[in-house]
Amino acid sequence: MAVKIKLKRLGKIRSPHYRIVVADSRTRRDGRAIEEIGKYHPTYNPSVMEVDAERVAYWLGVGAQPTEPVLAILKKTGDWQKFKGEPAPAPLLQPAEKAARPSFEAIGGEDEGKGEAITQKKKADKRDEAAAESSASEA
């Protein structure tokens, strides 16, 4: 049986998420997989590539062939170089640490409203007009 390591697409339209799977080469892209060995989320910045290196090494060792996109991912993570016995690539880009944001109270924010809402003023005006009309009709 010819085995391939390929991407299985998940997610909505224009929001792809992939699982790196080991499957028979004759199965459909999103068909049944033998084993899931990783994840790939290209829309995140930087993109997320999680690969189970031990299982990748096993499947490459028993003859599984990676597809071109999976081969590119394996080269970025360094698993392909480890399998071939070559030096590892430079480390991947890691997301930057976000600076601590000051709390709302520390900035001087107040928890008070700006005053009455516009709709309440309109209702008050209508009540005043109704009271003026009723007093005018009585007089």
From Swiss-Prot:
The positions making up the signal sequence are none
GO terms under biological process: translation
Q: Which residues form a coiled coil?
A: none
Read off the Pfam families from this record.
Answer: Ribosomal_S16
Swiss-Prot/TrEMBL keywords: Ribonucleoprotein, Ribosomal protein
Return the GO cellular component terms, semicolon-separated: cytoplasm; small ribosomal subunit
**Which Gene Ontology molecular function entries are recorded, alphabetically?**
structural constituent of ribosome
**InterPro entries (UniProt xref):** Ribosomal_bS16, Ribosomal_bS16_CS, Ribosomal_bS16_dom_sf
Extract the ranges annotated as region (Disordered). 84-139
Q: Which family does this protein fall into?
A: Belongs to the bacterial ribosomal protein bS16 family.
Q: Mind telling me what this protein is named?
A: Small ribosomal subunit protein bS16
Native organism: Streptomyces lividans
Q: What is the lineage of its organism?
A: Bacteria, Bacillati, Actinomycetota, Actinomycetes, Kitasatosporales
